[in-house]
């Protein structure tokens, strides 16, 4: 079976419509249908993004899905750039580093990358959709630690933990806390899905190479643990890939 571009949206990442939402400690993103508009538009402020689509728009077509994806990706990049600029330089100033240049790019293989010779950190914009602020701050501290240690030996993890905890005494920390947070943030399946949705060409590569046997689009409720138990706070679009 060949690749059918007209069924791209349905086959690979489901239909993104008003059921799609991101509600985290750093970002609230919602999609609404609106009668008095003829094309999609966005209203934003830092930490909040509302996307409006015409009431009669057919969201199952390739053209409309790609148009929505392009707008949302641009808006997510704006949010990420501003959030990371603020938080990165706040932490960098605390540890005595000069102003760090911040950029964002949709590289699906990485959440962030330190270019220490350029005094720059590049972040994947979808990482601002982590459910908790501590994962974003961990990522910042991880990349800032690379200004001191370029690879990942034990002293790198100790440095990252020192930055994350704000400690001055080198005898006051180990790497246990930071390694635990690193393991937690890597389990955020939602971020992987969003990055693939932002760059579906990677899924097409899986399909064209014959690795994918079946695809099932899913609209999945997103829950968060509270003092009252699990509470549904939104949905995310995902997919299930079964390999040969």
Model-derived features: where do they sit?
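Walker B catalytic acidic pair
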Residues: 143
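Active-site-proximal or metal-binding-adjacent scaffold patches in catalytic folds
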Residues: 1-138, 147-244
């Amino acid at each position: 079976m060949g690749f059918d571009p007209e069924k791209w949206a349905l086959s690979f990442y489901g239909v993104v419509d008003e059921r799609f939402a991101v509600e985290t400690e750093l970002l609230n993103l919602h999609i609404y249908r609106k009668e008095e508009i003829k094309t999609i538009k966005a209203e934003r402020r830092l930490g909040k993004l509302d996307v409006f689509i015409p009431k009669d728009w057919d969201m199952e077509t390739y053209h409309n899905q790609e148009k929505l994806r392009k707008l949302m990706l641009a808006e997510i990049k704006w949010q990420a750039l501003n959030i990371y600029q603020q938080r990165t330089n706040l932490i960098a100033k605390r540890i005595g580093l000069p102003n760090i240049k911040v950029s964002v790019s949709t590289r699906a293989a990485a959440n962030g990358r330190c270019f220490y010779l350029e005094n720059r950190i590049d972040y994947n914009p979808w990482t601002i959709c982590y459910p908790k602020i501590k994962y974003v701050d961990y990522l910042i501290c991880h990349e800032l630690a690379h200004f001191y240690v370029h690879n990942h030996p034990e002293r790198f993890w100790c440095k990252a933990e020192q930055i994350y905890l704000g400690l001055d005494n080198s005898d006051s920390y180990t790497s246990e806390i930071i390694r635990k947070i690193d393991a937690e943030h890597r389990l955020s399946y939602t971020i992987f899905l969003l990055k693939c949705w932002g760059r579906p060409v990677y899924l097409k590569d899986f399909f064209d190479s014959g690795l994918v046997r079946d695809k099932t689009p899913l609209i999945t409720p997103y829950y968060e643990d509270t003092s009252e138990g699990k509470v549904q706070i939104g949905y995310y679009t995902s997919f299930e890939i079964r390999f040969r």
